[in-house]
Amino acid sequence: MDAIKKKMQMLKLDKENALDRAEQAEADKKGAEDKSKQLEDELVALQKKLKGTEDELDKYSEALKDAQEKLELSDKKATDAEGDVASLNRRIQLVEEELDRAQERLSTALQKLEEAEKAADESERGMKVIENRALKDEEKMELQEIQLKEAKHIAEEADRKYEEVARKLVIIEGDLERAEERAELSESKCAELEEELKTVTNNLKSLEAQAEKYSQKEDKYEEEIKVLTDKLKEAETRAEFAERTVAKLEKSIDDLEDELYAQKLKYKAISEELDHALNDMTSI
């Protein structure tokens, strides 16, 4: 664009110079005409006064001839100058048209740039909204991780209490042979519980694979944690009840040991599942 403007300025300068030369040629022409007229007047006067002086007549005739040649030369220069001016005018017109087209392209480019900047602003606002949502999801995940840790702590506490009960029952382990058949039934129930916990694990892994849809499954996930927490609280209550009934174990050793064995396996599996769930949450 600057090169075009410089070129246009140079062409305008050439035009002005050509106009100056044309004006100078016109002035020379006028001067020659004036001088020719003066010479003609003088020649007429001399012819009237010196009709017999051929030398003077030849002299002035030569001067008149020179003046006419200068006049013709001036006319030619003026014609050439006018042609140069016309050519420069055409070139200036072409440059101005080219400048108009360049300005039109520049205007189009500026309009496209403005549209691109608007689109970039919209994209930036969308990114900020996504970042805010991701931050909220992360905060919810941290809260649920804390809830899982609390549930694990409850499970560990339940295990500890059951271990204490088990130590108290070591002295009567010899009487627990009849509990084997019932233990098999308990193992079957534990297998069912294991399948249930595997389902929970699969749900947690599914949540990890579908992190972008986490907010939609958040209620279900919290409900699962609540169910596990309720089960652990129920187990803790049963453990406390079992501890209070240690004095009566001699009368109901078979039933109590069956319950103890089943509950111990059950809550050991729950504790392991909570560890897996916590690890899954940590890796999300």
UniProtKB/Swiss-Prot annotation:
CC per GO annotation: actin cytoskeleton; actin filament; cytoplasm
Which stretches are tagged as biased composition: Basic and acidic residues?
12-38
Region Disordered: what ranges?
1-38
Q: Mostly located where?
A: cytoplasm
Cellular localization per UniProt: Cytoplasm, Cytoskeleton
Task: Name the UniProt key words of this record, in alphabetical order.
Answer: Actin-binding, Coiled coil, Cytoplasm, Cytoskeleton, Muscle protein
Which parts of the chain are coiled coil? Answer: 1-284
According to its UniProt entry, what is the function of this protein?
Binds to actin filaments in muscle and non-muscle cells. Plays a central role, in association with the troponin complex, in the calcium dependent regulation of vertebrate striated muscle contraction. Smooth muscle contraction is regulated by interaction with caldesmon. In non-muscle cells is implicated in stabilizing cytoskeleton actin filaments.
Q: What is this protein called?
A: Tropomyosin alpha-1 chain
Taxonomic source organism: Xenopus laevis (African clawed frog)
Lineage here is:
Eukaryota, Metazoa, Chordata, Craniata, Vertebrata
